[in-house]
From Swiss-Prot:
The keyword Magnesium does not apply. The record marks 379 as: Interaction with DNA. This is Probable tyrosyl-DNA phosphodiesterase. One of its GO terms (biological process) is DNA repair. Residues 22-32 have a biased composition (Polar residues). Residues 1-34 are annotated as: Disordered. Keywords: DNA damage, DNA repair, Exonuclease, Hydrolase, Nuclease, Nucleus, Repeat. Pfam families: Tyr-DNA_phospho. Belongs to the tyrosyl-DNA phosphodiesterase family. The keyword Repeat applies. It comes from Caenorhabditis elegans. Its main location: nucleus. Substrate binds at residues 133, 358. The active site is at 131 (nucleophile), 356 (proton donor/acceptor).
Length: 451
């Protein structure tokens, strides 16, 4: 499948009120540092029909006014991206990072752009993808703006879906010592995984002060990782950072079962039983240094659109292209349906916009404790699977894909996209799958026939 171009589907039918304007912050833009925003509904092929706290790509770029840009994406439509820049800023350097198989097509699209550099990220394990969605933008005043997103750089992802992005920034230090920060360390460690392909950006970011940022980057990089667990990416990295943020508390009373919610747009093969991975090593990483007692095991739910959720969405069944779960996979893990909940976002007025965002949240005594916004879906390919390599006599973590997310532990900055309490699937609900025919007409009068 070509991943560098994506056509824009039909019009949206969602109607929501106009956005609230934020005051300009000390970062020189209208974006609040440390905040999570939604992308708009409409605004490209149809009139914009806003939801609160949303920003379009052209608004972001007009606010920041980058003179040097680094974009990571899975799918990338260059004409859409460059068209989102203000005309006066289209002749500045842009570096684009995609999966190595997609780099040749992108090079063809940008062959007349002298200041555009294309980087192809290595995908050493079959079926892996370069799934990271992140932008680092340098402005003329020496600020470096970091955006961690769930949206690909294609029109449909920025118009008809429930997407989110996280924003923050740092300031270049002209001379003297740059204060050390975990956020900067995270960023530089991730860029190092591209070997020497992004060394120029590493050198720039080494001179940037990110010390005001308390949030942490949670990322995955492909490969067979045999280094110590504390140095591994994927879900072991989440375990380590959660353990640092929330050390073991022997005095804590488990009066209720804590709840973990995963919300994603695709699901991988998780095994024939939940203990294989879902409630095994993945849940153990979500719990960090504070595992639930055996008498009160953690509850774990998955928010994923049902057939009816997609059928009644603003794009109808076409919106289901962004939630590519397959019936052939679901048939092997029917146990998962008992954990599934419908997509509901009435509080944010986005129930009718199919979710492409990915969110992981811990609730304790019905209160959200942390939120993770990420590109990583619920899959071993994204988060990794620990196994023992008998031939090498070593434990290894196998990850197929590149992923990027940000962990926020400050409740005042949470922006959880789904409603809580959750709405479980009914006895007649089924998850939307792309390889099964759906004959009941959708909101646009169409049926779904598998491609």
């Amino acid at each position: 499948m070509k991943r560098t171009i994506q056509e824009t589907p039909g019009p949206s039918s969602t109607t929501v009120p106009p956005p609230k304007k934020l005051n300009s912050q000390r970062n020189g833009s209208n974006l609040e540092p440390g905040s999570i925003y939604f992308t708009p509904i409409g605004g490209i092929s149809v009139p914009r029909q806003e939801s609160e706290s949303s920003r379009s790509l052209d608004e972001i770029l007009a606010d920041i006014r980058p003179i040097n840009s680094l974009h990571f994406s899975f799918m990338l439509d260059f004409e859409f991206l460059i068209g989102s820049y203000p005309p006066s800023l289209r002749e500045y350097p842009i570096t684009l990072v995609v999966g190595a198989p997609d780099a040749p097509d992108l090079l063809k699209c940008t062959k007349n752009q002298k200041l555009v550099t294309v980087v192809g990220a290595s995908l050493p394990i079959p079926f892996g993808t370069h799934h990271t969605k992140m932008s680092i933008l340098e402005d003329e005043d020496g600020r470096f703006h970091v955006i961690v997103s769930t949206a690909n750089l294609v029109p449909d992802d920025w118009e008809f879906k429930t997407q989110q992005f996280y924003y923050n920034f740092g300031v270049k230090i002209a001379s003297g010592t740059v204060p050390r920060s975990d956020f900067q360390d995270d960023l530089l460690e991730y860029l190092s995984m591209y070997r020497n392909q992004l060394d120029t950006w590493k050198q720039l970011l080494q001179k940037v002060d990110f010390s005001q940022i308390s949030d942490r980057l949670i990322f995955s990089t492909p490969g067979y990782h045999t280094d110590p667990p504390t140095q591994r990416p994927g879900h072991p990295r989440l375990f380590r950072i959660l353990s640092e943020k929330f050390p073991f508390d022997a005095s804590y009373e488990h009066t209720e079962r804590c709840t973990f919610v995963a919300q994603c747009s695709s699901i991988g093969s998780l095994g024939s039983a939940p203990i294989n991975w879902f409630r095994g090593q993945f849940l153990q990483s979500l719990e960090g240094a504070n595992p639930s007692p055996k008498q009160k095991p953690a509850k774990m739910y998955l928010v994923f659109p049902s057939v009816e959720d997609v059928r009644t969405s603003c794009q109808g069944y076409a919106g289901g292209c962004s939630v590519p779960y397959r019936n052939s996979v679901h048939a092997r893990q029917k146990w998962l349906q008992g954990n599934m909940c419908k997509w509901r976002s009435n509080a944010k007025r986005r129930t009718n916009a199919v979710p492409h965002c990915k969110t992981y949240v811990k609730y304790d005594k019905k209160v959200a404790i942390w939120q993770l916004l990420t590109s990583a879906n619920l899959s071993k390919a994204a988060w990794g699977e620990v196994s023992f390599n008998k031939s090498k006599n070593v434990e290894q973590l196998m990850i197929r894909s590149w992923e990027m997310g940000v962990l926020i532990t400050d409740p005042s900055r949470f922006n959880i996209p789904f409603d809580y309490p959750l709405v479980p699937y009914s006895a007649t609900d089924e998850p939307f799958v792309t390889d099964k025919k759906h004959e009941k007409p959708d909101i646009l009068g169409c049926i779904w026939t598998p491609p």
